[in-house]
A protein has these predicted regions:
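Conserved P-loop
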Residues: 1-70, 126-128
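N-terminal targeting/trafficking signals and adjacent low-complexity tails
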Residues: 71-78, 98-99
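Short loop/turn elements that form and flank the Walker-type P-loop nucleotide-binding site
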Residues: 27-28, 44-46, 75-77, 109-112
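Amphipathic alpha-helical interface surfaces
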Residues: 12, 60, 64-67, 82-86, ...
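N-terminal cationic-hydrophobic initiation segments that often serve targeting/anchoring roles
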Residues: 24, 72-73, 105-108
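Generic beta-sheet signal
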Residues: 2-4, 31, 79-83, 115
Length: 135
């Protein structure tokens, strides 16, 4: 798992889009990009599966966790899952998302999928369960 962090307006979304596009060049499996807006859909290479969670009515952490697990379960060829704004999508501060981070760690281990996430916070404000994945 990789965390792209920083206060709002520090280029996290551009960094995750660039990361997804770069991952596609070396990926042997599928690359998926999850966010809650269509704003950046055309910044991603067309081969990346773009999912706007707003279209699926996700409104909380449990729904997001189920959505992510469903994506992994539906296709064993998924290699990368990029999530822009996980706390915003889950509707909670990142400090309250330990269970979804634990679920993603388990998915990485069990299904060899790699997660890349953006979190709007300074490094010193990241909870330990997030900070251990931040560079």
């Amino acid at each position: 798992m990789k965390i792209i962090y920083g206060p709002k307006g520090t280029g996290k979304t551009k960094a995750i889009i660039d990361g997804a596009n770069a991952a596609l060049d070396s990926a042997k499996g599928h690359v998926i990009f999850i966010t809650d807006t269509n704003r950046y859909a055309y910044d991603l290479k067309y081969q990346i599966r773009f999912l706007n969670v707003s279209a699926f009515g996700l409104q909380n952490e449990d729904a997001l966790r189920g959505f992510i697990k469903g994506i992994v379960a539906a296709n064993g060829d998924n290699e990368y899952i990029f999530i822009d704004g996980i706390a915003r999508i889950a509707g909670k501060p990142v400090s309250e998302l330990e269970s979804i981070f634990a679920a993603m760690e388990k998915l990485e281990k069990d299904f060899e999928v790699k997660f890349v996430l953006t979190v709007s916070a300074a490094k010193e404000d990241l909870p330990e369960f997030v900070a251990k994945h931040a560079n």
